[in-house]
Structure formats: C-alpha cells, structure tokens
C-alpha cells in the first residue's frame, strides 16, 4: 500500500519527479508537472493548480451572476496568446516588408501578454518580468501606426492612438497625459479590466525630445516636461482618469486605471537621428551599408538599426524615458517596389477595397499596370510613403465613384495611367461588350 501511494505524492508535487518517472500531464490544459506548483491526481486523470484556480474563478463569477444579476458585466478579455511566428504571419497579411520590425514586435507582444498571464502564478520570491514597451523609429509612412493597429486587432484588445505633440505638462494649455488613458477607457466601452490590458500607440514621440541640451530657466512644457509626465504611466502605476476626458478638477470623480499591464508602443520619424549615429560610428565599422542612401529620405536605410540609448539621449530623450522603452526597432524606408506591393498585396490593400466598393454596384474594377506605376510615382514625389497612396487614389476615384451609380449597363471600369494623370477619364465597358465609353 505504501508503494502505491508514494508515486501519487510525487505526481502531486508538481515540480519534482522522483525515480526518473516521466512528468505527469494535466488532463485539462496539457501542462506538465514541471510547469506548475502542484498536480492533483484522480482516477485516470490529473488536474493542475492553475486549472483548479481557473475553475474556482469561473464558478465564483457564475454564482455571483445568479445572486447579483444587476451587477453582471462583460468578463475581462484574456488575449489569446499566439506564438511569435503566428503573430508575424498575421502581420504579414496586412503589412508589407519591415521583416525585422515585425519579428521584434511579435516577440515583444508575446512576452508582454505571457508576462500578464504568468503574473498571477508568480511567487513573491521568483523573478518578476518587466514590461516590454516598444519604440518604433522610421520615416513617415513606413507603417508604424499600421503595425500597432494590426496587433491590437489581432489580439482583440482595446486600442487608442495619441499624438505626442498635443501633450503638455499639467497646468498648461494642451492635453494631460491622463487623457491618453481616458481614450483607452472609451475604446474599451468603460470596461476597466479590458482597458488595463489594452495597447496605446503614441505617435510623433520624437517631437517631445528636449529642445536643448542646456538646462534652461524656462520650462519645456511640451518636451522634457511631457517625458517626465509619461514616465509614470509607462512604467506602471495607478492613475486617476477623468471618465469624460479633459483636465482634472478637484470635484470631479476619477476612475483609477492600473497601467502595469498596458502595452505602450511609441513611434517617431526622428529626423536627424541618423546623423547622430553616423558621428558615433566610423565609416569602416559601418560596412557596405554606409554608402547606400535612400533616394527619398536621404539617409542610409541601415544606419538607424545601429541606434543606441546614448544616441536617443543625445537626440533629446531623457535616460529615464528611454529606459521605459526597452524594445527598439527601426523601420525601413519604402521603395517603389514596396509601395507597389502595398497597393495590391495586403489583405485590406487599397486596390482590393476599391474593387469591393465597385463590386457592390455590380461593376468590375480594373487597374492597368501602368496606372499602378503612376500612383506609386506620384506617391514617391510627395515623400510621405504609403500614406500618400490613399490620397493619390482618392483624388482620382472620387469623381468616378460620384457618377458611377447613375451610369446604366456598365459592367467594367478600367483605370489607366491617363486616368491617374487626369488626362482622360476611365474606360467603361457596357454589358453587351460592344460599346466602350471613355469618360
């Protein structure tokens, strides 16, 4: 009898495995005894401590909902934790290029939500994993905002975008940093638990760099002062937020938000940062990449990948602020080939969107290769990357979409390079196939 009981004690010990026996596997979640603190054995089945606690929480909520139906609310959403490979594959469907940035983001996001999941099971004497906020560096229109937005959609977590240029220190004209959290709360439909697991993208973060390396007697209310104000919410703290946004006032009721599990992604063009890096890095150590400059941006597309915290400090970010953004990734400028692919390849590519709109009117939309090349050419001239593609197409398509619903018997609309240049309108094909009309 003693020998029969002894293995069961080993099985329920969780992390230990005496006698060289294979680890026990939880029948519910599949975790092994090495991954949990304890394992309870039953007839032909095992259950780990994590599944037990999860079951208790589920039952507690169900009982509470029965006893207090008026207090029943949507349960906190736990993002489905996908592997970095799966996250990147999902990003690939919407974002063209930027392979390095997508890998960095995938790993950072995976570790962030794994950290949240593991926090409840971490003993006080175990290693606590710090938050992996992210800094994206790259020219305008390279996909910084799109990457953050796509990640939030993929994980189905609340998401909001804030413009750093609108932020000022408390007491000055402009937005407090707390307004960022208020927007996230709105995005979560005031579900506090969901908001506390959301993602915030702070754009134009380079614009709050310290204006001068010299200490001034005048306050830098939109530069270093904002960096100091952002520190508190970046590192994780409980912040009182006005539910309707705007400035705080003494008589206003505040909602306390814990930012410990909110992922912050900051992005900026950081114009001139490449020159700071170039001064630090000798030509010999920069290698072959140092001689190749991007035609649109005028800087070496590889040089930003060499950025260090010291470079960012020289640029104007304070060390404490840089330290709150441990994951840094530089995005590549988009060349003509990448812009052309962005037009047609992503799951929600602009060309696909317009084709779907025309399809709703029973008309097939076609872009000639020359037309797409012309769109890319104009976008490159504007110098705003992928952002220019939509404005170029919208400028052309607005008149066509205005008159299309009133045209009869049209089955196909062909956009040519002349259409993009506004030399002539599109070519319409009628349903009988015999008549071609040029607008």
From Swiss-Prot:
Parts forming coiled coils: none
Keyword Metal-binding: yes
Record's keyword terms, sorted: ATP-binding, Chaperone, Metal-binding, Nucleotide-binding, Zinc
Region forming the signal peptide: none
Domain ClpX-type ZB span(s) in chain numbering: 13-67
GO molecular function: ATP binding; ATP hydrolysis activity; ATP-dependent protein folding chaperone; protein dimerization activity; unfolded protein binding; zinc ion binding
Binding site for Zn(2+): 26, 29, 48, 51
SMART domains on file: AAA (SM00382), ClpB_D2-small (SM01086), zf-C4_ClpX (SM00994)
SUPFAM superfamilies: Glucocorticoid receptor-like (DNA-binding domain), P-loop containing nucleoside triphosphate hydrolases
Family to which this protein belongs: Belongs to the ClpX chaperone family.
Function: ATP-dependent specificity component of the Clp protease. It directs the protease to specific substrates. Can perform chaperone functions in the absence of ClpP.
HAMAP family: ClpX
Subunit note: Component of the ClpX-ClpP complex. Forms a hexameric ring that, in the presence of ATP, binds to fourteen ClpP subunits assembled into a disk-like structure with a central cavity, resembling the structure of eukaryotic proteasomes.
Protein name according to UniProt: ATP-dependent Clp protease ATP-binding subunit ClpX
Lineage: Bacteria, Pseudomonadati, Chlorobiota, Chlorobiia, Chlorobiales
Protein's gene: clpX
